[in-house]
Amino acid sequence: MKKVVMVAVAAALLGGCAVKNQVSHSLQAIPLTAFQQSESNPNQRVYKEPGVDLRQYNEVLLDPLQFIRQENGQWYLLTANEQNQIGRYYHDKFQSELIKQGVKIATAPGPKVMRIQAAVTNFDLTRPDPKLRDLLPAKIAINVTREVIGKEPYLLKVGSMAQLLDSRSGKLLVRVMDARESTDTTHKDEPITAEEMEEMIDQWAASRAKQLADNLGR
């Protein structure tokens, strides 16, 4: 059984009713051709602003995980309560893994402080494929396959965008996207639970915390 998931190190959204405005303000347009394959992770795509040196930062400010909603404000296969639970779990787990790696956690913007922002951008169901497909979203939008019927196993794709910012100026430093493959499948009529998402977050948080720690100054 397989479930394909896209999860990123970080992307921009600051929550609540301000989601729409914040997306257009924070996520400046960057063509997918500007992203390069990561040397350490072939499934990861990275955009880095020219001249940026992450070693000048030695603390991180972790924003809450947010969700880009559909026009009707509803998620496909995920309830609002589960969204809140997933958001809290993401924040606590990622912060814990960062601390394990020796990364200092800031509580406010400041010099040498990097802001990490993350948001889930889309859910999609597709028929299983033996090859991991390119899951990079072409735009910031929900993309749900609505014509799926029956109880055949389907792969779940969870899209996310990512960015690291200077905490004081808001300048974009790095944006990251990556495709991950888990070991489960789902069916269209089975709701995706917070517990299933937490297993994915555990793996992601540990690997991304180490990756970030390796690139920051100490």
Predicted regions and their residues:
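Extracytoplasmic/secreted envelope proteins and their assembly/folding machinery
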Residues: 83, 87, 91, 95, ...
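C-terminal/domain-edge helix-coil "capping" segments
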Residues: 18-49, 150-159, 163-218
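N-terminal post-signal-peptidase region of extra-cytosolic proteins
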Residues: 39-50, 79-80, 98-104, 147
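Surface-exposed short loop/turn segments
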Residues: 96, 101-169
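N-terminal segment of the mature soluble domain
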Residues: 55-117
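Extracytoplasmic/periplasmic, Sec-exported soluble proteins
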Residues: 54-57, 75-86, 90, 150-156, ...
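Sec-dependent N-terminal signal peptides
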Residues: 4-12
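C-terminal motif of bacterial Sec signal peptides marking the signal peptidase cleavage site
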Residues: 14-16
